[in-house]
Amino acid sequence: MTEVQLTILHTGTVLVDQALPYHRDTDPPLAWTHLLRPKSALVEIPVSCYLIENSHGLTLIDTGWHTDNRTRWGQIKNLRHQYPTNKANLPEGQAIHEQLEEHGIRPQDLDLVLMSHLYCDHADGLRLIKEAPRILVSEPELRAAQKDRIRYLPSQWKGVNLQTYAWNSRVGERQAYDPYGDGSVMMVFAPGHSPGLAATLVRGTETVVGVKPGVIGDDLRKYILLTSNVGFGRPSFEERLRPGVVTDAKAAFSSLDWACAAGADPRCIAMYANHDPEVEAGTRSLV
């Protein structure tokens, strides 16, 4: 059996109001912006990227913060109107290209870069790995980013050959993109937080027999689920808390319910949310 390796890379942290990752009905309007809120409402959470190594080579999911954020002025210039809401912390050695270099990998060695979505803490590092041969995001996500200059910062992918993919498969009833044609890596349409958000299924080769299709469908292989920002951490899934920032609240709850069901499936060996402070960096293996 071929071993699949998933390496979780923490590319710094982001300081946000606790209402941004976890929306509660008791939150005041726009609480996620931290407007008129106490410092005690702030939380610092990791910003994650994922390196997948399988028979198809090296696949990177998301890119984290850019090194511009290492100075206060550089960060203000880079994040612009989003700076008051999202404050980046990127220690030396934690930018995506620096961590890849530690693993002996150059951006041009990557076979594929897949973006879960294009919000600032996920897309900011695109310029650091622009030499990668293929960088893809879902078509609805790029379309939204080209129109919405409040939620997105197109300067973050200036000079990057960012291309789109179309849904070409399904995971259960959800549309999905299968870049390699064998279901080993699947980008699953999970909108709500953003219009084109995609979670990621990383499959091994071991199977679970006798399992019902459920929300994942009839593929029997074990998998790791990367929820991206469908949920931010344990409270998301245990208390059914959608993100504070959404473009479609109903869709966000639907995607969250799907992730909960997918995470509870007997084929799922682990589920990781991008900003979960309980998830440690490092390499996981599945066969």
Model-derived features: where do they sit?
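Metal-dependent catalytic neighborhoods of phosphoester/phosphodiester hydrolases
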Residues: D124-E131, G282-L286
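Cap/insert and terminal regions of metallo-dependent hydrolase folds
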Residues: T67, Q82-E98, T205-V287
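Core dinuclear metal-dependent hydrolase active-site scaffold
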Residues: Q5-I8, L42, C49-E53, T59, ...
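Active-site metal-binding loops of divalent metal-dependent hydrolases
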Residues: T11-T13, T63-H66, L118, E141, ...
